[in-house]
C-alpha cells in the first residue's frame, strides 16, 4: 500500500549551524523538503523546548507565527501544527490566526490539536492546567469554536469553558468547508472519539505495528458508533528516523544525538534507524498495520543530505 510523508521540525536547535539565524535554517529545511517532494512540514507547538528533544533554554520560535512565515516562503508544501494544546490560546483567537495562515498559504494549512500534557509549561506561562478530564472537554469545545468561527458568518457558541457571541471572522479560510483538523493522542475513550466525531486526520505519537493496529481498531469502533467514515480519516504517525550505514555509525550517532533529557533505550525505542532498506522494512510493517502517512523527524535535520537520501531511497518505495 502507498504512504505519504511529511517532515516535522522537532527543534530549532541546529548544532552544526549554531551561528545562523534559527528561523533562516528552519526555512531552508522547509524549502528543501518542498523541493524533495515531502507533502507537509510540521512544527511543535510548545512555549519552550521539552527535555526529551533538547534543553529547555534552546531556541523554539512560536508555532503559528512561524507557520505564517513559512507559508509566505513556500508554494506547494502543506503546513501544520503537531499539535497545539487547546489551553494555550483562546480558540476564537486561534480561529482568526489559522484563518489568516490558510489565506497566506492559499489553502495549505492543517490544524493539529491536542489536550496538552506539559504541566510545567502551562504553569510557567501562567496558564491553567486542569485535570485531564477537563482538558479533554476543553479540547472538544475548542474544536467546536474553531468550526463555528471558520464556517459561520457570525459565530455563536455557548459552552461550559468557551463562549463566542455573534463573532465575525473575515476573511474565512481558503479551504472549504474548513482547514483539515488533526487530533493527536492515543487516549482510547475520549481522544479517539473526538477524532472520529470532528477530525479529518489522527496522529499516533508512536507505537509498534501491533499497538498502532490496536489503536486504529478502537478508532474504527468509535466511527462505527458515531456513523462517521473511518476511511476518510488520515492515519498519521510521528516517526523519528535516523539513517546509519552500519551498527558502528548507529552507535556513534546515538552518542552524538540522544538528548540529555532522554536515554539510549528510550531513544532507540522511539526512533526508526538503520539503512534505507532497514528503515523501509520497518515503515512497511507500520503501513501493514494501517498507518497511511508518516510525519518523520530527523535528529540532525539541518544536515540536509539526510533529507535527500531519505527522499531518494525510501519515499519512492511507498509511492
Question: Predicted regions span which residues?
Answer:
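Active-site-adjacent structural elements that line small-molecule/cofactor binding pockets in enzymes
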Residues: 1-319
